[in-house]
Amino acid sequence: MFTESDYEKLHQIMAESPEKEELLTKLLHSHRMDISTISHEIRNPLTLIYSTLQIIEASNPEVLNIRHWSDLHSDIEYMKQLLEELSAYNNGQRLSPSSTNFDIFLKKIALSFASSIIETDIEFISRIEPGLPVMPADSIKLQEVLLNLLGNARDAVLIHQSTYSPQIHFHAWKDHSNLIISVSDNGCGIAPEHLSAIFEPFVTYKSSGTGLGLPLSRRIIEAHGGTLTVHSEPDLPDCQVKTTFTLTIPIP
């Protein structure tokens, strides 16, 4: 699979001449088709295996007591998740834009996330500045990006034992010709040696996950003509924000 840096180099080469652009466009299309085909071919037998396990359980409930039976279920669920995220990553640059009122859109996301952490001790601070644009965007994919970033922040503050209240900040504002959205937390932070790799596919420093969430998020934002960056200082005191992901999308 191509990394983000690979794609950047390919696009630089494509800009050199129409002939190179045509050739590499065909190559990239073929690459995406290969990933889609592989995902499809694996998903079908995996679904059959999962269905067979359910039939076995229904007919023979005693198998639930077999050692590692639950691990088998977990492994299959992981494979299903991996295939879904791989397919999503492959299609990350394909947008279906529609007119999006970002004031309404972001407030709905903030409300949805706040509801999901209501039973935790997390303090969620949302600040949606007035005057946000109404502009074309793929709201479904942007929602996926923002909920992924907020979910990562939630995980970071929950696994980090601190004497301070866990906090997540969600801030959106308009800066000249850009829409800017940031997600910050005072969790564990990201080690400096890991920062350069977190947007690469299959790189993860969590105990669970596929390592495709952040690469997919960056791909979606770049498809909107924007950027997704991160700044983290894990050595700061627990009372301070340690990690901030900043999403910038140009306003037409």
Segments the model singles out, each with a brief description of its role:
Residues 118, 123-133:
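Conserved catalytic submotifs in the C-terminal HATPase_c
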Residues 213, 217:
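Short alpha-helical Gxxx[C/S/T] motif in the catalytic ATP-binding
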Residues 190-201:
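Short conserved segment of the HATPase_c
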Residues 164-177:
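Short beta-strand/loop element within the Bergerat-fold HATPase_c
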Residues 2, 66-116:
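Conserved DHp (HisKA) dimerization/phosphotransfer helix of two-component histidine kinases, i.e.
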Residues 226, 230-233:
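Conserved glycine-rich
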Residues 1-30:
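Conserved signal-transmission helix
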